[in-house]
Amino acid sequence: MKRTFQPNRARRKKKIGFRARMDTSGGRRILSARRRKGRKTISA
């Protein structure tokens, strides 16, 4: 059986990168929540 995580740098950037997060209101909400929580990394 194939594993569920198939790493792909381009797809990762496109889906959960900083620019992708900043593109939508929901994404910006995610970033602010992670900043508020004090995450060391806020996006991929």
From Swiss-Prot:
- Return the similarity comment: Belongs to the bacterial ribosomal protein bL34 family.
Superkingdom of this entry's organism? Answer: Bacteria
State the PROSITE patterns in the record: RIBOSOMAL_L34 (PS00784)
In the record, what terms sit under GO molecular function? structural constituent of ribosome
Question: Could you tell me which residues belong to the region Disordered?
Answer: 21-44
Task: Please provide the record's keywords in A-Z order.
Answer: Ribonucleoprotein, Ribosomal protein
Single Gene Ontology BP annotation: translation
Biased composition regions of type Basic residues, renumbered to the chain: 31-44
- Name of protein: Large ribosomal subunit protein bL34
Q: Which gene encodes it?
A: rpmH
